């Protein structure tokens, strides 16, 4: 009981000079919680004495943890360009500057400057998407999963959607196409087998309950060997013959030809649009190289129906997303592809990567063992699962640390690396030019005195 009486009073405790200049409201909340935990520890015989300095430090640590940004800038040295866990596609600084201007001023998000009345937010990207893809109309929601859900809910509620069994995919975060269909109200009708789906499977499955023929791009895995599938071009023709909607969930979408024969595994938006599809959707922040968004393009009358769905308001994008997406679209239209970081990384020549790696090696080899090697990496983001692309990496070895420990040390200092052949690798496919100096300084601070 005497120990309980020794617990500091909150009002007196928060007056300590260590808390000067800090938010009194937040310090009070943290102090109350800390002192309550102390009381419980005393009652459970976990504490024998009270150290007020320890309590003060606990409160200060909690305050710092709460008020420090959780999202932190990192150096991606994994080589994975569209790294799902590290924020997917990077954005161009110039685009961000323009978006900041939009965010910090009033703007015409939903205001028609010509007519002087309410406008539509999607008009800011529609013309650009029409010019870029030759679509009739377009709309954007907050990600491609939302796009899939919205399309199915708009056109297929209580109706059948025909999908090949081999395309009922699961992507990151346990996002499963069949479950999304169920949540949308659509009724899944599986056809074919895991490895083979034929034209006759589609034709035999169509009935009066059918609303849509859907194709899902197998972005994060592939079926090889004894297998076959029906092309989307053929699916479009079948749908048109039966007065049905055809829809292609492309997952990751891209506009330009990709290096290293990546087009073989990733269909081009422009190629698909040649078939004049009813609808297709794709992610904005994968190979398209923009902000997170679900981009839907297709027939004007179908997009108009999507716009009338009440769910659209729940899934709509904000002014920042639209401003950033508009900048990316302008980069495509102007053929300024170097201003799209994802494409720039993909297209950087191996000689350039090698030069950067050698430059860093020369500056760091005095305090850590390193070697420039040729290796390979992957695009990431659930795209091109079987394709590896050439890259250059700097291997790191230290006599005091095993690879796992060295990787951990780097990670705690904002460098995310990978381990290959029992060595830590810094992959220059994703290391920005501006990162090189930062890496040099970090390695020097960590290892100069321990080599």
Curated annotation (Swiss-Prot):
Necessary cofactors: pyridoxal 5'-phosphate
GO terms of biological process kind: conversion of seryl-tRNAsec to selenocys-tRNAsec; selenocysteine incorporation
This protein's GO CC annotations: cytoplasm
Gene Ontology terms, MF aspect: L-seryl-tRNA(Sec) selenium transferase activity
Main enzyme class: transferase
EC number: 2.9.1.1
Keywords of this entry: Cytoplasm, Protein biosynthesis, Pyridoxal phosphate, Selenium, Transferase
Entry keyword annotation includes Membrane: no
Domain of life, source organism: Bacteria
Subcellular location(s) of the protein: Cytoplasm
Pfam families hit by this protein: SelA
Pathway assigned in UniProt: Aminoacyl-tRNA biosynthesis; selenocysteinyl-tRNA(Sec) biosynthesis; selenocysteinyl-tRNA(Sec) from L-seryl-tRNA(Sec) (bacterial route): step 1/1
Catalytic reactions of this protein: L-seryl-tRNA(Sec) + selenophosphate + H(+) = L-selenocysteinyl-tRNA(Sec) + phosphate
Residues annotated with N6-(pyridoxal phosphate)lysine modification: 286
Family in the record: Belongs to the SelA family.
NCBIfam families registered for this protein in UniProt: selA
Function in brief: Converts seryl-tRNA(Sec) to selenocysteinyl-tRNA(Sec) required for selenoprotein biosynthesis.
Stated name of the protein: L-seryl-tRNA(Sec) selenium transferase
């Amino acid at each position: 009981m005497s120990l309980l009486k020794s617990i500091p009073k909150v009002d007196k405790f928060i007056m300590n000079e260590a808390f000067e200049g800090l938010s009194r409201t937040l310090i009070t909340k943290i102090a109350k919680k800390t002192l309550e935990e102390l009381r419980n520890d005393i009652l459970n015989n976990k504490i024998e004495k009270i150290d007020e300095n320890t309590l003060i430090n606990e409160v200060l640590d909690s305050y710092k943890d709460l008020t420090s940004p959780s999202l932190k800038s990192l150096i991606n040295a994994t080589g994975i360009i569209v790294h799902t866990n590290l924020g997917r596609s990077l954005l161009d600084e110039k685009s961000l500057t323009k978006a900041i201007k939009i965010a910090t001023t009033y703007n015409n998000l939903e205001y028609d400057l010509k007519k002087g009345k309410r406008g539509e937010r999607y008009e800011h990207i529609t013309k650009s998407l029409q010019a870029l893809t030759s679509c009739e109309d377009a709309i954007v929601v907050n990600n491609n999963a939302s796009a899939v859900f919205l399309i199915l809910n708009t056109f297929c509620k209580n109706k059948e959607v025909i999908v090949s069994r081999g395309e009922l995919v699961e992507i990151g975060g346990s996002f499963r196409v069949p479950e999304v269909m169920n949540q949308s109200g659509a009724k899944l009708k599986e056809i074919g087998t895991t490895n083979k789906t034929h034209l006759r499977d589609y034709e035999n499955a169509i009935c009066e309950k059918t609303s849509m023929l859907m194709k899902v791009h197998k972005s994060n895995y592939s079926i090889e060997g004894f297998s076959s599938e029906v092309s989307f071009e053929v699916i479009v023709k079948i749908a048109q013959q039966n007065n049905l909607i055809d829809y292609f969930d492309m997952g990751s979408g891209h506009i330009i030809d990709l290096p290293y024969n990546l087009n073989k595994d990733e269909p081009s938006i422009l190629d698909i649009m040649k078939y004049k599809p009813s609808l297709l959707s794709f992610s904005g922040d994968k190979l398209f190289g923009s902000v997170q968004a679900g981009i839907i393009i297709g027939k004007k009358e179908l997009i108009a129906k999507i716009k009338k769905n009440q769910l659209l308001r729940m899934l709509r994008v904000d002014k920042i997303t639209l401003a950033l997406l508009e900048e990316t679209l302008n980069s495509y239209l102007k053929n300024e592809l170097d201003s799209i970081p994802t494409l720039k990384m993909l297209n950087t020549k191996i000689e350039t990567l090698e030069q950067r790696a050698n430059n860093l090696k020369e500056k760091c080899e005095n305090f850590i063992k390193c070697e420039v090697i040729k290796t390979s990496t992957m695009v990431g983001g659930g795209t091109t699962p079987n394709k590896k692309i050439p890259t250059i990496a700097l291997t790191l070895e230290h006599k005091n640390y095993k690879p796992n420990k060295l990787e951990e040390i780097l990670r705690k200092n904002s460098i995310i690396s990978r381990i290959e052949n029992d060595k830590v690798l810094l992959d220059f496919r994703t290391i920005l030019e501006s990162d090189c100096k930062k890496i040099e300084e970090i390695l020097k601070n960590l290892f100069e005195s321990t080599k």
